């Protein structure tokens, strides 16, 4: 994969992630959860703009052509399973992180390399936020062990 393709793939991945988080933000009735996904969507939009800037800087006379389908491919994903959806989102963050690290490794310009490493680090932070959501969901689903209630409830 050449650098143009890597930038294009990274931008397409950011747009797909934005679309995923936008859909997730709309699908929850809980305001806190909606805000969480809306914020992630904004982070991904910021990444898209930064990567577009890097592309324009490196290839100033070449128009960026997005070729991938920009809707999130979620065949086989159980949308009714919040944990599965969050794990899918984590996999998308991991993909973006790998692309940024590969681009940084290939970059000769120090400022470009630094920005790409920063983007990779931010993707790691996004993963941590998503893992925290999984823990929160699991905590809500398993907030007590029924056996601990034996003796406290009348039969």
Regions found by a protein language model. Name each.
Residues 1-155:
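Iron-associated oxidoreductase/ferritin-like identity signal
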């Amino acid at each position: 994969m050449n650098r143009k393709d890597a930038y294009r793939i990274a931008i397409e991945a950011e747009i797909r992630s934005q679309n995923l988080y936008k859909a997730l933000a709309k699908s929850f009735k809980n305001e806190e959860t909606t805000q969480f996904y809306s914020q992630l969507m904004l982070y991904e939009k910021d990444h898209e703009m930064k990567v577009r800037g890097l592309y324009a800087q490196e290839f100033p006379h070449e128009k960026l052509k997005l070729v991938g389908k920009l809707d999130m491919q979620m065949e086989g994903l159980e949308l009714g399973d919040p944990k599965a959806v969050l794990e899918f989102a984590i996999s998308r963050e991991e993909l973006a992180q790998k692309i940024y690290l590969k681009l940084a490794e290939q970059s000769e310009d120090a400022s470009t390399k630094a920005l790409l490493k920063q983007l990779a680090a931010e993707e790691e932070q996004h993963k941590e936020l998503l893992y925290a959501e999984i823990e929160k969901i699991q905590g809500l689903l398993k907030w007590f062990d029924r056996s601990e209630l034996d003796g406290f409830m009348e039969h």
